[in-house]
Swiss-Prot record:
It comes from Methylacidiphilum infernorum (isolate V4). It is an enzyme of class 3 (hydrolase). The gene is dtd. This is D-aminoacyl-tRNA deacylase. InterPro entries: Daa-tRNA_deacyls_DTD, DTD-like_sf. Its EC number is 3.1.1.96. An aminoacyl-tRNA editing enzyme that deacylates mischarged D-aminoacyl-tRNAs. Also deacylates mischarged glycyl-tRNA(Ala), protecting cells against glycine mischarging by AlaRS. Acts via tRNA-based rather than protein-based catalysis; rejects L-amino acids rather than detecting D-amino acids in the active site. By recycling D-aminoacyl-tRNA to D-amino acids and free tRNA molecules, this enzyme counteracts the toxicity associated with the formation of D-aminoacyl-tRNA entities in vivo and helps enforce protein L-homochirality. It catalyses: glycyl-tRNA(Ala) + H2O = tRNA(Ala) + glycine + H(+); a D-aminoacyl-tRNA + H2O = a tRNA + a D-alpha-amino acid + H(+).
């Protein structure tokens, strides 16, 4: 399971030029499910995302979590994070989980996060989305669980 975590000032998702959801200060999480992933991988990723200290404290040190700042979280399914460009110029998605497995785990992860933290929005699995964001920093971390 791969999570691309971006600290944002704001982020939004549109589908067919219609707004779906938006957040203010917080984290934009792009989530990819790989072959072999399971709920345990999801649980590890959830704990990291909610508790990683990527927000600045009063002294400017990255010392506060999403929970500490009471920020918002936007989760966007992003299977291309599981892609590889090892040979040639065309990406291979051999490591990406099949769509039905990936959707089940995406729903599990987003549901578990929503149970733990209420300020959560999410994109739609399988949809072509436009994602808008204003990075804060920029601060971006790649998590593999």
């Amino acid at each position: 399971m791969i999570g691309l975590v971006q600290r944002v000032k704001q982020a939004a998702v549109e589908i067919d030029q219609l707004p779906v959801c938006a957040i203010g200060r917080g984290i934009l999480l792009f989530l990819a499910i790989e072959k072999g992933d399971n709920e345990k991988n999801g649980d590890l990723l959830i704990e990291k995302v909610l508790n990683c200290r990527i927000f600045s404290d009063q002294s400017g040190k990255m010392n506060l979590s999403l929970l500490d700042i009471r920020g918002e979280l936007l989760i966007v399914p992003e299977f291309t994070l599981a892609g590889k460009i090892a040979k040639g110029k065309r990406p291979s998605f051999d490591m990406a989980a099949p769509a039905e497995v990936a959707k089940k785990l995406f729903d599990y992860v987003s549901g578990q996060i929503e149970n733990k933290y209420k300020a959560v929005k999410k994109g739609y699995f399988g949809a072509d989305m436009s994602v808008y964001l204003i990075n804060d920093g920029p601060v971006t971390f790649w998590l593999k669980c």
